[in-house]
Amino acid sequence: MDFWLYKQAQQNGHHIAITDGQESYTYQNLYCEASLLAKRLKAYQQSRVGLYIDNSIQSIILIHACWLANIEIAMINTRLTPNEMTNQMRSIDVQLIFCTLPLELRGFQIVSLDDIEFAGRDITTNGLLDNTMGIQYDTSNETVVPKESPSNILNTSFNLDDIASIMFTSGTTGPQKAVPQTFRNHYASAIGCKESLGFDRDTNWLSVLPIYHISGLSVLLRAVIEGFTVRIVDKFNAEQILTMIKNERITHISLVPQTLNWLMQQGLHEPYNLQKILLGGAKLSATMIETALQYNLPIYNSFGMTETCSQFLTATPEMLHARPDTVGMPSANVDVKIKNPNKEGHGELMIKGANVMNGYLYPTDLTGTFENGYFNTGDIAEIDHEGYVMIYDRRKDLIISGGENIYPYQIETVAKQFPGISDAVCVGHPDDTWGQVPKLYFVSESDISKAQLIAYLSKHLAKYKVPKHFEKVDTLPYTSTGKLQRNKLYRG
């Protein structure tokens, strides 16, 4: 199969592929730049490299260049400590790291993109490629390609089953795992997203999530497969993002619930040109859903994982009207089921589809990961009679107290409705009698007593679900994509 970027350069060449508000690259520009850089990357003779990058056009060129050079990319979370980065890269035998940000890491060859000479210094906002390397460009037809054609520089085809990217799970409930994502995985995910969410060549997708995460990288894959425009943003600033939404004909945006909340606080009270607001990474509260729908915001709640190359469950605004607690229905190209449902229909969510990884690179032990072709997500879920899927908690987060199963999400939902509590999380606390009992961590600027909380929670929860321990904290630990890091609270 021809590389998707190569196809877009041939068929959709003059369409804007990527812009950061200052510079804009057409698909022709992007392909030419990536192919020329790929030729230089081949000189490093690496089949797998780490990428320590920001959300920038240069980073996107680097990603495509690696793929054109048949190099697997291992994405590095830039918020990790040096020790965490080292452990991750060593676990998958990475020796060289390309970066667009300053990085010092012992034991690796670090190569800054600024130190690699290629043509990408003088791309202008009008989409014309300057001749900075002495390469002559054939402009006799609508497709602008080097006379030293990319086909003579690189192989323009690839194998769908080759590894495209490697990402590490967020590690919110345990050790991080290295997830290999093939081009087939990414393609199946993009097709599923198109079917459940909807996008086309006229889409203008504002990408604010880090591209070292699957939620950010997936936008780039969808774009190059479909041929739409990505508006890349390096850092989230609610005021600036709102201005872009108002002024730049943004049709799609990917957010986590907290960033949507900030935008609504900033004044996102109407959709403007927005057709789809894709949400994921954390649970949506009923209050946020109600507020967003009152503003007629086109919110689509979703659920996905690094192992599934992003979303595979999507809830439309209509679904959220009917069932605010749902993450929707599966894409047509995946199959989901509940393993060993209890009397309430709750059990572990299993998924099978071409978007699902084949197995972890590290650790390699697959015990319990796959069963009869289905991947065990580790999430407790329910599928109702209409096909709506509800996600309750991670299996590892389930609190078992005296033989009773307690879902932290149920307690957290009630606690967040207490006046003055802005955030809350419930974890299992060791107990000599019951094995575990619930402990509630909460964020509040008010003075709230344990007795007040017990009285309130007792009105809404069964007695065994009411937390026995409470702790007020300034903040709760979240990852850069808004996922709660419960493992950092288990010590308490």
Curated annotation (Swiss-Prot):
It is an enzyme of class 6 (ligase). Its EC number is 6.2.1.26. The keyword Nucleotide-binding applies. Gene3D superfamilies: 3.30.300.30, N-terminal domain of ligase-like (3.40.50.12780). Coiled coil: none annotated. It comes from the Bacteria. It catalyses: 2-succinylbenzoate + ATP + CoA = 2-succinylbenzoyl-CoA + AMP + diphosphate. This is 2-succinylbenzoate--CoA ligase. Signal peptide: none annotated. Pathway: Quinol/quinone metabolism; 1,4-dihydroxy-2-naphthoate biosynthesis; 1,4-dihydroxy-2-naphthoate from chorismate: step 5/7; Quinol/quinone metabolism; menaquinone biosynthesis. GO terms for molecular function: ATP binding; o-succinylbenzoate-CoA ligase activity. Keywords: ATP-binding, Ligase, Menaquinone biosynthesis, Nucleotide-binding. Converts 2-succinylbenzoate (OSB) to 2-succinylbenzoyl-CoA (OSB-CoA). GO terms for biological process: menaquinone biosynthetic process. Belongs to the ATP-dependent AMP-binding enzyme family. MenE subfamily. The keyword ATP-binding applies. Pfam families: AMP-binding (PF00501), AMP-binding_C (PF13193).
